[in-house]
Swiss-Prot record:
It comes from Homo sapiens (Human). It comes from the Eukaryota. The chain crosses the membrane at residues 39-59. This is cTAGE family member 15. It is found in: Membrane. Residues 118-269, 339-498 form a coiled coil. Its main location: membrane. It is a single-pass membrane protein. Residues 572-591, 662-671 have a biased composition (Basic and acidic residues). InterPro entries: cTAGE_MIA/OTOR.
Length: 777
């Protein structure tokens, strides 16, 4: 006791030293007290670390306990679902047995129908021979008619050639007439164009003449208006000038009178001048200015008191003479101005007369032009009348020619229409004859095809009957081999029961060894399945509970009453009265001619199985085989399921069964006589076991060998099984789960094969032999 106690002391010392170093490395504010609560700091730290680890361990243990409880609940749920699936599988198997019974009845009916079909085929052959003779006669008659029609066709062809020649001549004449009509039409078009051009020119000329006439009338009216206006203006001016002339003449006369008076006065004054000269010398004293003189004269004239009368008179005369000179000068200026005005008036008068003469000459020229244009207009109108008459005559001539040509063309068209009617009749007759010939040829082809199809259909029926007979023979051989295999199964089950009674606790033995070592030719190598083991296994064992043994033992090893020995009878009962029709294939059978009857060994060898835990790929799904049916409750001993599920109770296999299976068995017994009655609910329920329902395979693992059974015809080894807790026939009780703490390595699963055989099963039954639809022509 000292040695184990001495070993932890250095470790504890090291731990305490490390703790002291850590505490010393802490700052003073972080350091704990030397004696917290009366304990040293090292013990406190150790206690804290130990408490932390204890908490972690407690959490880990609680997590494990909760997880184990959840796992137990999950296993219970899985067990419940597994039991439900097993019950559903049982129902499906019962329905499958009913379908198998119906198929057996259908095969019996088909065998009976074959005989009646042969009689009907013989009668049909006789009727076909009679119809062939009739058709040959009708064929000869049709050939004669074809010869006659060929002669008629030759005659019609000769007539058709003559009509073609006539049509060619008529077409040539029509073309010539069409050319002539085209030339005439072109001439008519040209004449129409010329007429249109003449009409356009005439219209233009008429428009120009109208415009010229309108302009001439407008010019004449404007000329008249201008002439009248100018004449009125000139008349007014002449009247004014005449008035001025009269006034001027009056003024001239008055001026002449004034001049005469002045001249007389001048003469008198000239007579008084010498007298005035003498007096002038006296008056020349004051010669400074004439104005002063006049002022003095005026003053003296005004005063007049101191002067003499003669002087006054002389002065007055001088003054009056000066005034007269001034007035005369002014009158001469006015006279000159009036003379100038009169000369200007004469000039304007002369200009007006000249302008009037020019207007008169223009008027004469315009009148002459108007007369010329009127004469030209008359000439053009005469030309228009002549041209219109000429064109009307040409149009009448062309119209007469066109009417003649149209009448001729109408006659030719009538002739052509008659010829075309004849041609159409001839072509219709040709088409009718051709249609008749084609119809006759089609009838001949139809008759030939009809008889060929009938011959082919009879050949197919014969071939199908031969294949059906061949498949029936093979099914018989399969049934015989299945009977032998069932006997072997009985021996295997007896061995299993004996081993279970002797050693019920041998559960540690591998499950795969039983499925592999119980083959009739020895164990198969790893990764390869032998055809013998496949022949002894049932496809229904995958869906059943693990290690469930079949209560159906047809013709088995001396237990209970066996079924009848007729190999054609698929309904074989065992010691419990349950039906069984497990049909297994012969692995050594030769392949047939058709694809659906090939050897299952060759097909199964080509199959590739995936590793355990993986599903089949889409391209590698195992094919299904038709003509293979299994009973409701047939089970073999070589099946197994994963070891997480419960194994069935073998002690109570002959005892308790669920009420559902008993009721289904009673229904199956009651329906044995009603094989031909279809069940509408079967197709929908059978979809669960269709081609898409494929369980994942398990890898075969070879285990230890089991004890040898020397009683059967083959050397067998059977595994000892421990007695599981009580349960039903199709599974263990839901509350039971196998222990998990077995000593040694985990158990390998049993070697399993696919639930379905390697051949493909079609989704419908094979048609009855001899039933073919009538060929429709």
């Amino acid at each position: 006791m000292e040695e184990p106690g001495a070993t932890p002391q250095p470790y504890l010392g090291l731990v305490l030293e490390e703790l002291r170093r850590v505490v010393a490395a802490l700052p003073e504010s972080m350091r704990p007290d030397e004696n917290p609560y009366g304990f040293p700091s090292e013990l406190v730290v150790c206690a804290a670390v130990i408490g932390f680890f204890v908490v972690l361990l407690f959490l880990w243990r609680s997590f494990r306990s909760v997880r184990s409880r959840l796992y137990v609940g999950r296993e219970q749920k899985l067990g419940a679902t597994l039991s439900g699936l097993i019950e559903e599988k049982c129902k499906l198997l019962e329905k499958f047995s009913l379908i198998q019974k119906e198929y057996e009845g259908y095969e019996v009916e088909s065998s009976l129908e074959d005989a009646s079909f042969e009689k009907a085929a013989a009668e049909e052959a006789r009727s076909l021979e009679a119809t062939c003779e009739k058709l040959n006669r009708s064929n000869s008659e049709l050939e004669d008619e074809i010869l006659c029609l060929e002669k008629d066709l030759k005659e019609e062809k000769s007539k058709h050639s003559q009509q073609d020649e006539l049509m060619a001549d008529i077409s040539k004449s029509i073309q010539s007439l069409e050319d002539e009509s085209k030339s005439l039409k072109s001439q008519i078009a040209e004449a129409k164009i010329i007429c249109k051009t003449f009409k356009m020119s005439e219209e233009r000329r008429a428009i120009a003449i109208k415009d010229a006439l309108n302009e001439n009338s407008q010019l004449q009216t404007s000329h008249k208006q201008l002439f009248q206006q100018e004449a009125e203006v000139w008349k007014g001016q002449v009247s004014e000038l005449n008035k001025q002339k009269i006034t001027f003449e009056d003024s001239k006369v008055h001026a002449e009178q004034v001049l005469n008076d002045k001249e007389n006065h001048i003469k008198t004054l000239t007579g008084h001048l010498p007298m005035m000269k003498d007096q002038a010398a006296v008056l020349e004293e004051d010669t400074t200015d004439d104005d002063n003189l006049e002022l003095e004269v005026n003053s003296q004239w005004e005063n007049g008191a101191n002067l003499d009368d003669p002087l006054k008179g002389a002065l007055k005369k001088l003054i009056h003479a000066a005034k007269l000179n001034v007035s005369l000068k002014s009158l001469e200026g006015e006279r000159n101005h009036i003379i100038i005005q009169l000369s200007e008036v004469d000039k304007t008068k002369e200009e007006l007369t000249e302008h009037i003469k020019n207007l008169q000459t223009q008027q004469a020229s315009l009148q002459s032009e108007n007369i010329y244009f009127e004469s030209e207009n008359q000439k053009l109108q005469q030309k228009l009348k002549i041209m219109t008459e000429f064109y009307q005559e040409n149009e009448m001539k062309l119209y007469r020619k066109l009417t003649v040509e149209e009448n001729y063309r109408i006659e030719e068209e009538e002739k052509l229409s008659r010829v075309e009617e004849k041609l159409s009749r001839a072509t219709e007759q040709l088409e009718t004859y051709r249609k008749l010939a084609k119809d006759l040829e089609e009838e001949l082809e139809r008759t030939v095809h009809f008889y060929q199809k009938q011959v082919i259909s009879y050949e197919k029926r014969g071939h199908d009957n031969w294949l059906a007979a061949r498949t029936a023979e093979r099914n018989l051989s399969d049934l015989r081999k299945e009977n032998a295999h069932n006997k072997q199964k009985l021996t295997e089950t007896e061995l299993k029961f004996e081993l279970l009674e002797k050693d019920p606790n041998a559960l540690d033995v591998s499950n795969t060894a039983f499925g592999r070592e119980h083959a009739p030719n020895g164990p198969a190598p790893l990764g390869q399945r032998s055809s013998e083991t496949r022949a002894f296994l049932s496809p229904q064992t995958l869906l059943e509970d693990p290690l469930g043994l079949s209560p159906v033992l047809p013709e088995g090893g001396g237990r209970g009453p066996r079924g009848p020995g007729n190999p054609l009878d698929h309904q074989i009962t065992n010691e419990r009265g349950e039906p069984s029709c497990d049909r297994l294939t012969d692995p050594h059978r030769a392949p047939s001619d058709t694809g659906s009857l090939s050897s299952p060994v060759e097909q199964d060898c080509k199959m590739m199985f995936p590793p355990p835990g993986q599903s089949y790929p889409d391209s590698a799904l195992p094919p299904q085989r038709e003509d293979r049916f299994y009973s409701n409750s047939e089970r073999l001993s070589g099946s197994a399921e994963p070891r997480s599920f419960k194994m069935t109770s073998l002690d109570k296999m002959d005892g308790s069964m669920p009420s559902e299976m008993e009721s289904s068995r009673n229904d199956a017994k009651d329906d044995l006589g009603n094989l031909n009655v279809p069940d509408s609910s079967l197709p929908a329920e059978n979809e669960a076991t269709g081609p898409g329902f494929i369980p994942p395979p398990l890898a075969p693992v070879r285990g230890p060998l089991f004890p040898v059974d020397t009683r059967g015809p083959f050397m067998r080894r059977g595994p000892p099984f421990p007695p599981p807790p009580p349960g039903t026939m199709f599974g263990a009780s839901r509350g039971y789960f196998p222990p998990r703490d077995f000593p040694g390595p985990p158990h390998a699963p049993f070697a399993m094969r696919n639930i379905y055989p390697p051949r493909g099963l079609p989704p419908y039954f094979h048609p009855r032999p001899g039933f073919y639809p009538n060929p429709a022509f």
